[in-house]
Amino acid sequence: MSIFSIFRKQKSAPLARERLQVLLAHERASSGTDLVAVLREEILSVIAKHVQIDNDRVHVKMDRDEHVSILEIDVEIPLGAHLRAA
């Protein structure tokens, strides 16, 4: 690397790629909240077919890593819950 390479203008392809990666990361992060809300409602409806539960006792969380997304679901089912026929 020479002293002159510091002052050279960066090529447009790497700059465009970096901007695209930032844009994609932003879109993925913003769309996650809607997905979690939809999944929560669908999970609640499926569980409600079989067991009576309190909707406030169901927690759905999505964590995103660089390579994977993790969906965490916590459902508190009362010990004396009566099963329903599906």
UniProtKB/Swiss-Prot annotation:
InterPro entries: MinE (IPR005527), MinE_sf (IPR036707). Pfam families: MinE. Keywords: Cell cycle, Cell division. It comes from the Bacteria. One of its GO terms (biological process) is cell division. Prevents the cell division inhibition by proteins MinC and MinD at internal division sites while permitting inhibition at polar sites. This ensures cell division at the proper site by restricting the formation of a division septum at the midpoint of the long axis of the cell. Belongs to the MinE family. This is Cell division topological specificity factor. The gene is minE.
